[in-house]
């Protein structure tokens, strides 16, 4: 069956590389190295999630990504880095995580058929 990639933090950047280098539909969460790879063009649909209060990924970097890839859905949540990880008690944000999960599942449902 169809394959997709999802990644968080370092894996978020790896998910971007899956879309740009391997042509695999991908969703990346707060991938800090994605900005360094923004010259690469997605060969498959992808979606990105970031936190507005992420101390590792400035919103200016997210703006650069948006400008370079205007057709790539990018969602920014009022949360910090690692907002999706419920083991990170200082940064987990249930509302942001739930919405990001809903968007991620909708993305894959539409593309992995």
Question: For each predicted feature, which ranges?
Answer:
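Short beta-strand/loop motif that positions the catalytic acidic residue
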Residues: 42, 47-50, 54
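Short alpha-helix in the alpha/beta-hydrolase fold that links the catalytic acid
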Residues: 57-67
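C-terminal catalytic histidine-bearing segment of alpha/beta-hydrolase fold enzymes
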Residues: 71-113
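Acidic/histidine-enriched, beta-strand-rich ligand/metal-binding domains
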Residues: 15, 65-72
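Primarily recognizes the serine-hydrolase "nucleophile elbow" in alpha/beta-hydrolase
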Residues: 1-44
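Acidic catalytic loop of the alpha/beta-hydrolase fold
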Residues: 53-57, 81
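Conserved hydrophobic packing residues within short motifs/helices of P-loop NTPase cores
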Residues: 27, 47-49, 75
């Amino acid at each position: 069956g169809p394959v997709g990639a999802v990644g968080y933090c370092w894996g978020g950047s790896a998910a971007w590389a899956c879309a740009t280098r391997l042509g695999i539909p991908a969703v990346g969460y707060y991938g800090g190295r994605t900005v360094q790879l923004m010259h690469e063009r997605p060969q498959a649909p992808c979606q990105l999630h970031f936190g507005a209060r992420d101390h590792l990924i400035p919103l200016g970097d997210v703006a650069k990504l948006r400008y370079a890839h205007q057709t790539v859905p990018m969602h920014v949540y009022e949360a910090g880095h690692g907002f999706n990880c419920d083991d990170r008690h200082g940064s987990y944000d249930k509302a942001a995580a739930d919405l990001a999960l809903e968007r991620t599942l909708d993305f894959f449902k539409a593309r992995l058929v």
